[in-house]
Structures are given as C-alpha cells and as structure tokens.
Amino acid sequence: MPHPTDANCRSCHSDAGAMQASLQLGRKLPAAAFDFRPEQGRVLFKAPRPERGYTKIIHRFATDHPEFQVLAEKLKDPDTLHFNHALHLTSPNIAPLKSRKLDCADCHKPDAAGVYHLKISYNDHCQNCHSLQFDVHNPDLPVPHGNAGHVRDFLRSLPEQYADYGAKKGIQGRRELETFVQEQMKQIREQAGSGGELERRVFFSDARTGPVARIGLTGGLGAARFPGCAYCHEVAPSGGEVPQVSSPVLTDRWLIRGRFDHGKHFKVACVFCHAAERSRESSDVLLPSKQICVRCHSPQGGVADDCSTCHSYHAPRKETVAAR
C-alpha cells in the first residue's frame, strides 16, 4: 500500500460530512473495536475514548490539530510508585552520583534502536542510593526486594538469616555462631522492637512520621537508610496475610496512536520537552504540549509536520505493526 499523503488524510479528516458519518458509525460499534493493537512487551497508556471519538476536523498539525488528549483532559500517570523528579534533579540534599548531580540519562537510557528507552529497574537505577539495609549493624544483609512474601519469610526467619550471614562472614563453630545470632537478634529488637513490630515497620513505615521512621541507618555518601516499603510503594494490610505491595507500572508509550523516535531528537535537551525539574508528583504526565512540538514541527519551525510524520494509516499491514 502506498504511503498516505496529507491530501489522503484530509480527504476524510478535513471533511465535516465524513467525520460526522464516522461518528455515527462509531456509536454503533462495540468499544472493543477501537482497542489499539498491543505491542508485545510494552506498557501502553490507554486514554479513554472521547465521546465523539477522533472526529475533530483537522487541516494541519500547527493550526487545528487538538492538544494531546492526555494533556487536554489532564489525565494522570497510573503508576503508584512514589517518585519526585524535581527532588532527584534539583535538591541539594541528593548525594552526587560519581561526583555530579543526577540527570535524566542516569535513569532513562535509549534502547539499541534509539527509539524507546530501556526498562527502569530497582537493581539498575535505585539501589545505589536507596538501599535495603534494615539493620545498621549488618549492612550486608538486606531485605529482599520484589516479592512481599519473600520479605515476610525473611523477617520471620531472621535467626536462620543471621546464622547464614555469620557463616559467610567466617564465623566458625556452633557455639560462636549461636552467640552471634543471639547478639544480632537482641540488637535488632532494640532497634525496632519485637518481630511483629519489625515486620510492621518494614512494610508500612514511610520514613515521614514518628519513631517508625528509623528502621536502620547506614553511613556513607549515597547509601541511604531503608525507610520502609511504603516510602516508595503503596502498601495495604491484607487481613493477616502478606501485605499487598503495589508493583510499579512504568508506561513505555503514552501517545499510542502516534509514534515518536527519541533518536531523531537527541540534540534537543530533555528539559526542553519534559518539565521534570518542576514535577513533584508521581501522577504527573511529563509529555510536551502540542505547542512545544509546533516550535519545530510547523512551516515556521522548518521541520516536517505532515500527518505521516507521527501517524500511520488506520489499518497497517501486520508486518508494519510488528516493526513499529
């Protein structure tokens, strides 16, 4: 199928009669008919379909193309992970990483093709500063990460954990190892109370209020204390069962009916398009507005602004979908 031109697009999208007919037909179709084709392995942001569908009259991007829906409707990032971009990028209280302040590229790294970004993970991007060192006296014995059940099992088997830890540290002899375990259990109870209290603190403390804020404290630049799961995650009790700890939902693609290639924009500073330095809420969607795009993608800006710059035809061949 030949590549569609702007004239092809305008033959429908600039025709009020065609758009009205599309609106009426769309109201007769099931909602599932408009579901966007999923991209395997990618997390897509699915905005609610507008009441009139996508039938606004459009002549060209710079003039009457609507604002991006996620911004026009002030939609929120569904991720429940607590994260403050402004704090990480601008706060003087954030320890330097390799003798310099954090910047976008410390966490957001392009994939091999340069189009998308690699997944962000705790192990690769968080643990250097946000440790899981719950015991100040044994910083090499962290709480496990990624599974609430494993965390509870770890805390309820602390004597065995300390025994294994002591053996790895070279403590030999049954009596010496038993003494080590007893000493560690005594000091951790002095730090955080009984086993049940320690478990409550590990899961539900968010390091913001009261005595539960201090579970453990480690020294060293960039080695932060472990404040509790609730510092970063939504945590809910579960009737005596393992607490429910929310998993991050990190969106790969926001404007799923368009396309964007970061590699073609590598000369543009991140902050030109993304207001990360002013974002303090995890729910903020840090997409550029249409007006920011128009600065370049318009006749005045001199960069391509035809429809196919960002959009494919509605029903591409299967191999085209797979390649995007």
Set out the residue ranges of the language-model regions.
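Short sequence/structural segments immediately N-terminal
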Residues: M1-R324
